[in-house]
Amino acid sequence: MLSRLQELRKEEETLLRLKAALHDQLNRLKVEELALQSMISSRRGDEMLSSHTVPEQSHDMLVHVDNEASINQTTLELSTKSHVTEEEEEEEEEESDS
């Protein structure tokens, strides 16, 4: 019974580290998404000023952003051995307390 409890605790720790790693990855992807949206917005602004080939260029940008192949080339960092900072550990403790 004691060994089973230890196994469950190890599994819980692993899952918490995985959760933290996925949370970090999600935050990185959100930042990347905002950067891409900003690039698109700035290019649209530049295109409005030049006013030639506007529809074709903006369409190409949207196709590139929505291109499934380019999205699938993004590598996800899912290693459970990633370093968990003290802040993340504190956040995990706070979340588990609620």
Curated annotation (Swiss-Prot):
Region annotation Disordered: where it falls in the sequence: 73-98
Record's keyword annotation contains Lipoprotein: no
Phosphothreonine: residues carrying this PTM: 85
GO biological process entries: snRNA transcription by RNA polymerase II; snRNA transcription by RNA polymerase III; transcription initiation at RNA polymerase III promoter
The UniProt record lists the keyword Transcription regulation: yes
Extent of Polar residues compositional bias: 73-82
Swiss-Prot/TrEMBL keywords: Nucleus, Phosphoprotein, Transcription, Transcription regulation
Cross-referenced PANTHER family: SNRNA-ACTIVATING PROTEIN COMPLEX SUBUNIT 5
Xref: Pfam families: SNAPC5
Locations listed in the record: Nucleus
Function: Part of the SNAPc complex required for the transcription of both RNA polymerase II and III small-nuclear RNA genes. Binds to the proximal sequence element (PSE), a non-TATA-box basal promoter element common to these 2 types of genes. Recruits TBP and BRF2 to the U6 snRNA TATA box.
InterPro entries: SNAPC5
GO cellular component: nuclear body; nucleolus; nucleoplasm; nucleus
Bias type Acidic residues, positions: 86-98
Subunit: Part of the SNAPc complex composed of 5 subunits: SNAPC1, SNAPC2, SNAPC3, SNAPC4 and SNAPC5. SNAPC5 interacts with SNAPC4.
Entry GO MF terms: RNA polymerase II general transcription initiation factor activity; RNA polymerase III general transcription initiation factor activity
Protein name per UniProt: snRNA-activating protein complex subunit 5
